[in-house]
């Protein structure tokens, strides 16, 4: 891992299925002073991950889950370790309360709940009631809620309705990095705010500036691959702006920063820098919208919940979100 000079806090999310490898990874990150915070992700619902026994499948084995989280905490020193998970694999296999209690007992600094099951993937609505139940069950460390935070007011409602200590933002910030500034404003943590109204959504001209900056930073960090990775972000940024399908199609074919600059300049000139966002687009999901889909598990995975045997080594090679 590497971070920009002065970037703080240096936070990294780890995915692992085997306690010893997680222990070694955390020990290395801490010993080399590479991080200020480590998050463990047990939320990935994708079949390629769960069928190998990774991601959202791990909390079904509470002793294995305990061993992995404990291995991370035991090697983290003063660096806080947080844990993210889903409600469970499906409504018949809910694991979030036990997972929260285990993480609390072995020394996690906080837990985060994506309030959907793995079967839901990213469909339907997040079950904020589950966040409230987790908050009631886990009493000595912070509990964060995740799911359906599209606007700053969603975060306030989630905290008010559940009593949780904070929120985790996922898809809501894709194409809308200013959501974090809006959250700081409504929480009263912005230098210009005492807990006030956020700014109006940016017009097209400001979005184009943000897109160009984002792309340059991504290329600086990832090299030539960065511009290809940025292609998918262009649709997320422009969702809700009446720019037309041709512009979106062209932007998703860019090969270099010069392509992006030329297309953005032409788009702003044609549509006007003051083109506003359709307010109804704020709540349109970006990125994943698939689901529900039956969760695929390794054969016999549910036979013995107390079995702490890690899944095969190939499960460690799979990486995704949650």
What are these regions (language model features)?
Residues 1-14:
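Short, structured active-site "lid" loops
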Residues 18-20, 152:
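The beta1-alpha1 cofactor-binding region of Rossmann-like NAD(H)/NADP(H)-dependent oxidoreductases
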Residues 6-8, 77-78, 139, 223:
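Residue-level preference for short coil/turn positions at secondary-structure junctions
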Residues 95-110, 129, 133-145, 149-322:
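Alpha/beta catalytic cores of nucleotide-metabolism and tRNA/nucleoside-modifying enzymes
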Residues 13-16, 125, 149:
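Conserved residues at beta->alpha junctions
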Residues 20-54, 58, 62-142:
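Alpha/beta enzyme core
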């Amino acid at each position: 891992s590497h971070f920009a000079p002065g970037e703080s806090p240096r936070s990294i999310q780890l995915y692992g299925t085997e306690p010893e490898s997680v222990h070694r990874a955390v020990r290395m990150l801490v010993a080399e002073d590479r991080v200020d915070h480590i998050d463990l992700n047990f939320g990935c619902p994708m079949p390629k991950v769960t069928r190998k026994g990774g991601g959202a499948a791990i909390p079904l084995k509470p002793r294995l889950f305990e061993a992995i989280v404990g291995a991370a905490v035991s090697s983290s020193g003063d660096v806080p370790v947080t844990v993210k998970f889903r409600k469970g694999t499906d409504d018949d296999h809910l694991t979030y309360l036990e997972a929260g209690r285990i993480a609390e007992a072995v020394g996690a600094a906080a837990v985060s709940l994506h309030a959907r099951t793995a079967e839901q993937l990213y469909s339907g609505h997040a079950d904020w009631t589950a966040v409230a139940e987790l908050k009631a069950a886990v009493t000595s460390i912070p509990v964060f809620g995740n799911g359906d935070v599209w606007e700053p007011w969603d975060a306030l409602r989630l905290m008010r309705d559940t009593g949780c200590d904070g929120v985790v933002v996922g898809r809501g910030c894709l194409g809308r990095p200013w959501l974090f500034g809006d959250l700081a404003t409504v929480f009263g943590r912005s230098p210009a705010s005492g807990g006030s109204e956020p700014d109006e959504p940016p017009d097209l001209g400001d979005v184009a500036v943000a897109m160009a900056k984002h792309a340059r930073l991504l290329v600086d960090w990832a090299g030539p691959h960065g511009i290809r990775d940025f292609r998918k972000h262009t649709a997320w940024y422009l969702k809700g702006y009446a720019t037309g399908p041709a512009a979106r199609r062209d932007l998703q074919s860019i090969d270099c920063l010069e392509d992006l600059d030329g297309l953005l300049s032409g788009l702003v000139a044609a549509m006007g820098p003051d083109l506003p966002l359709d307010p109804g687009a704020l709540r349109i999901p970006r990125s994943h919208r698939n689901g529900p889909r039956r969760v695929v598990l390794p054969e016999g995975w549910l036979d013995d919940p107390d079995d702490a045997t890690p899944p095969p080594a190939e499960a460690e090679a799979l990486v995704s979100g949650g």
